[in-house]
Amino acid sequence: MLKPLGDRVVLKIEEKEQTVGGFVLAGSAQEKTKTAQVVATGQGVRTLNGDLVAPSVKTGDRVLVEAHAGLDVKDGDEKYIIVGEVNILAIIEE
């Protein structure tokens, strides 16, 4: 399993029509964003005075992420993307 560092997040992209709260996203919005599930998160980032700021997302969250963000990786037969937390636009609450 992949364990990201810092504020990076491992995502599994959902390959289906994107909906948010039951609403289907417009075609142009689907081209700019992807729906994904958080598989793993880094520990967070440290501030200048050394405090650790934990990620805002957790394993299992469904999120909306920028379509062209991140790095495509494989772990065995599974495909994932690794993104910085800054590229996650929203948590999808159901």
UniProtKB/Swiss-Prot annotation:
Key word Chaperone present: yes
Compartments where found: Cytoplasm
CDD domains: cpn10 (cd00320)
Presence of the UniProt keyword Cell cycle in the record: no
Single GO biological process annotation from the record: chaperone cofactor-dependent protein refolding
Pfam families: Cpn10
Recorded GO CC terms: cytoplasm
One example GO MF annotation: unfolded protein binding
InterPro entries recorded: Chaperonin_GroES, Chaperonin_GroES_sf, Chaprnonin_Cpn10_CS, GroES-like_sf
Alphabetical UniProt keywords: Chaperone, Cytoplasm
Self-association state and partner proteins as the record states: Heptamer of 7 subunits arranged in a ring. Interacts with the chaperonin GroEL.
Alphabetical list of PANTHER family matching this protein: 10 KDA HEAT SHOCK PROTEIN, CO-CHAPERONIN GROES
Function comment: Together with the chaperonin GroEL, plays an essential role in assisting protein folding. The GroEL-GroES system forms a nano-cage that allows encapsulation of the non-native substrate proteins and provides a physical environment optimized to promote and accelerate protein folding. GroES binds to the apical surface of the GroEL ring, thereby capping the opening of the GroEL channel.
Family: Belongs to the GroES chaperonin family.
The protein, known as: Co-chaperonin GroES
Organism: Streptococcus pneumoniae (strain 70585)
